[in-house]
Amino acid sequence: MINEIRKDAEVRMEKCLEAFQNHISKIRTGRASPSILDGIQVEYYGTATPLRQLANIVVEDSRTLALTVFDRSLSAAVEKAIMTSDLGLNPSSAGTVIRVPLPALTEERRKDLIKVVRAEAEQGRVSIRNVRRDANDKVKALLKDKEISEDEDRRSQDDVQKLTDAYIKKVDAALAVKEAELMDF
C-alpha cells in the first residue's frame, strides 16, 4: 500500500515537472524554435485548430522559422493567426512558404520573460509540494486506521520528502537552463 502511494506520488510529480518544462519551452528566447508557435490556433472549417496540425514548421536559421502550409488556401488564415497572437511576430508569405522572422529581444523584455519563467517555476514547485501533501495525508490515514506502524509512517514520509526534494531540484535545474538561455545574447 505504501509503495503504491509512493509510486503514485512519483508519477504525479513527474507530470508536474513535464507540465513546467512544457510551459517554459513555449517562452521565446532569442533563438528560433518551432515550439514558440505551439499555442497558436487557426480557424479551419469553423474550428480552432492547432497550427502544428495545419503546417510543417522548421527552423530556417537562428532567427527565422519557415512554415509550409498543407492547404494553400489556409496561408492567409495562418498568417493572420500568427500576427494576432501575442508573440509580436510579423510573418511574410513567399509563395508556398511563410517565413516568420523573430526580432531580437530587448534587455527589458528578457527580464520580463525571466520573471514569467520564475513564476512558472514557483507554480511547478507548489504543484510538487501539493502532491507531497496528498501522499502524506494518505499515509496518515493508513496510520489512523492502524494499517501501518508509526515507523512505517515516518519512513514513508521521509521517502516522499526525498522524492519531493529531487523533483524540486529538477525544476530548479530547468529554470537555471532557461534563464541562461534567455540572458544569452
Curated annotation (Swiss-Prot):
Entry's Gene Ontology molecular function annotations: ribosomal large subunit binding
Compartments (UniProt record): Cytoplasm
Keyword terms, alphabetized: Cytoplasm, Protein biosynthesis
GO BP term, pick one: cytoplasmic translational termination
An example Gene Ontology CC term for this record: cytoplasm
Key word Cytoplasm present: yes
Domain of life: Bacteria
Keyword Cell inner membrane recorded: no
Alphabetized InterPro entries for the sequence: Ribosome_recyc_fac (IPR002661), Ribosome_recyc_fac_dom (IPR023584), RRF_sf (IPR036191)
Entry's family note: Belongs to the RRF family.
Role of this protein: Responsible for the release of ribosomes from messenger RNA at the termination of protein biosynthesis. May increase the efficiency of translation by recycling ribosomes from one round of translation to another.
NCBIfam families: frr
PANTHER family: MITOCHONDRIAL RIBOSOME RECYCLING FACTOR PSEUDO 1, RIBOSOME RECYCLING FACTOR
Name of this chain's protein: Ribosome-recycling factor
Organism annotation: Yersinia pestis
Gene (UniProt): frr
